[in-house]
Regions:
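A short, conserved alpha-helix in the catalytic core of glycosyltransferases
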Residues: 25, 31-36, 41-68
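A short acidic, glycine-rich active-site loop
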Residues: 85-99
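Non-catalytic, C-terminal membrane-associated alpha-helical segments of glycosyltransferases
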Residues: 111-163
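A structural signal for well-ordered alpha-helical segments within the folded catalytic domains
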Residues: 49-50, 96-103, 145, 149
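Core nucleotidyl-transferase/polymerase catalytic module
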Residues: 1-4
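Active-site donor/metal-binding and catalytic loop motifs
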Residues: 65-89
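A recurrent flexible, glycine/aromatic-enriched loop bordering the glycosyltransferase active site
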Residues: 7-27, 89
Length: 163
């Protein structure tokens, strides 16, 4: 909260962050020799977070410059508006987006962010119960099953590409 107030008061703030998207990322070429290249197993989605997280793990710093503006060439895939007002981005997108973004985020979160497996699993159960109600309201049962498969593969550390 303190950093949020600081950001509102001064638009020229710098914040240290644990990981970042590729968009707007600047790094010295020698850093690539230390951290290597992005992990191909992620294929798409969360590969940028895993890659930049390695900088932090090796003692480096990622600094967010709040006064810089980045124009992204790609549109955000989960910004589509749904006909069902309760729909989640997890139940409204293509199978490709749903599967890889969910699976990779589950894998990344469990590997690098989770401090308590019990809390994580309880949170996951609550999330899945909420999603089943959304699936019922929006008639998205197949998408819900696909979401569960993606979560299962993330838990099992299965980062193979789908056929």
């Amino acid at each position: 909260m303190k950093n949020l107030r600081k950001l509102k008061e001064n638009s020229n703030c710098e914040f240290q962050i644990p990981f970042a998207p590729y968009g707007g990322l600047f790094l010295h070429k020698d850093l690539i020799g230390l951290i290597g290249y992005p992990n191909r197993k992620y294929f798409v989605y969360a590969d940028d977070f895993e890659y930049t997280n390695r900088i932090q793990l090796l003692g480096g710093k990622l600094i967010l410059l709040s006064n810089c503006k980045v124009s992204d060439l790609e549109t955000v895939w989960h910004s589509k508006v749904s006909k069902c007002p309760f729909v989640s981005r997890y139940l409204n997108q293509s199978s490709f987006h749903t599967y890889y973004s969910t699976r990779n985020n589950v894998y990344f979160s469990r590997k690098y962010l989770v401090n308590s497996n019990i809390k994580y699993k309880v949170n996951m159960i609550v999330f899945l119960f909420a999603m089943i109600f959304v699936a019922i309201l929006c008639m998205s049962f197949k998408r819900y099953v696909f979401l569960i498969i993606a979560i299962r593969d993330g838990f099992r550390e299965n980062l193979d590409e789908m056929a």
